[in-house]
Design a protein with these regions (language model features):
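General helical secondary-structure elements
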Residues: 11, 24, 34, 61-64, ...
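A generic structural signal for secondary-structure junctions
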Residues: 66-69, 79
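Glycine-rich beta-strand-turn "strand-cap" elements at beta-sheet edges
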Residues: 2, 32-50, 73-96
Length: 96
């Protein structure tokens, strides 16, 4: 199981549209194979968002990443566009 984080800062002028798009994001992400989707906004940095969810395979992660980076309507709401939509996957650390 991989944990995925998506991080971006919304363009202030496009915040309303982005929030409207985010209302259906959980459903869209689950349809692509994400589990336990959450979207959070920074307390100390309003407009900074992090989405997090779990996926079962690297392939699902890569498909979701490609899909999100190609989502021009949403990326247009991000300060800096798709280049500033950061997507990272993490696996459990093997300690000891």
């Amino acid at each position: 199981m991989l944990t995925v984080f998506i991080e971006y800062k919304l363009d202030t002028e496009k915040r309303s549209h982005a929030l409207q798009l985010l209302t259906s994001m959980a459903e869209r992400m689950e349809a692509m194979g994400a589990h336990q989707y959450r979207s959070m906004e920074g307390l100390d940095q309003p407009g900074l968002f992090v989405e997090t969810f779990e996926v079962e395979t690297v392939q699902v992660y890569e498909e979701i990443k490609a899909n999100r980076l190609a989502d021009q309507d949403f990326c247009d709401c991000i300060s800096g566009g798709a280049a500033k939509l950061h997507v990272w996957a993490f696996r459990p650390a093997e300690l000891g």
